[in-house]
Amino acid sequence: MAAPTVTMQQLIEAGSHFGHQTHRWNPRMKPYIFGARNGVHIIDLSQTVPLMARALDFVHATANAGGKVLFVGTKRQAQEPIAEAARSSGQHFVNHRWLGGMLTNWQTISKSIKELKSLEEQLSGETHGLTKKEVLNLTRKRDKLELSLGGIRDMGGVPDVMVVIDANKEDLAIKEANVLGIPVVGILDTNVDPSGIAFPVPGNDDAARAVRLYCDAFAQAASKNGGGANVGEMENPPVEATADA
């Protein structure tokens, strides 16, 4: 099946064209800016549509070839959509805090994942012989590891592509991917540096509805059985939200 599509109309309705205030821009985003309105940069969606299609095609081809897709979005608006995108497509995610070395020091991260699974096994079985305080401490340790590593617990190695919401906030993740030669798909607002992004997709990265649109599209692309659908035809369309200029 073909990769999913995102239309100009869907991007407009989601507020994807609203960038940040003009004084907050990154000059390297100039090629993707249409102009300014009321002190806010307007993103050129005539570029976003084909660039989004290119990124979706790449993610779709990677997933179909058995590749691993890692979704990264730790800002508040992205946390839930990112996790849902990964779970619905059978892929992987980081939506809490990027731990230094998550990719470049995978061996250590793997040990922490093993510890998480061991704690889960221990707590799911008989815990008599342990005091209430010991059980509480083990539970807290498990919960902390789950928050950081739960989304990559079954990744089994570094991913084949990374999809990022907000290149500024996830700069450490992008740097690690660049070091390892992992291609990065990035939603780029007008205040970010597009360097290191193999598949740039200019668009608002703050409005909840826009973030949901991107995540839904990439979730379909990353699903081995998905693709081919128009994202706007979903049964539960994203809820409207105001763009944060």
UniProtKB/Swiss-Prot annotation:
Taxonomic lineage: Bacteria, Pseudomonadati, Pseudomonadota, Alphaproteobacteria, Sphingomonadales
Cellular component (GO) terms are: cytosolic small ribosomal subunit
Q: Which cysteines are joined by disulfide bonds?
A: none
Q: Does the keyword Ribosomal protein apply?
A: yes
Disordered: where is this region?
A: 226-245
Cited HAMAP family: Ribosomal_uS2_B (MF_00291_B)
Cite the PANTHER family for this sequence.
30S RIBOSOMAL PROTEIN S2 PROKARYOTIC AND ORGANELLAR, SMALL RIBOSOMAL SUBUNIT PROTEIN US2M
- Keywords, comma-separated and alphabetical: Ribonucleoprotein, Ribosomal protein
What is the name of this protein?
A: Small ribosomal subunit protein uS2
InterPro entries for the chain: Ribosomal_uS2 (IPR001865), Ribosomal_uS2_bac/mit/plastid (IPR005706), Ribosomal_uS2_CS (IPR018130), Ribosomal_uS2_flav_dom_sf (IPR023591)
Q: MF terms per GO, please?
A: structural constituent of ribosome
Q: Which family does it belong to?
A: Belongs to the universal ribosomal protein uS2 family.
Per the UniProt record, one Pfam family is: Ribosomal_S2
GO BP, one example? Answer: translation
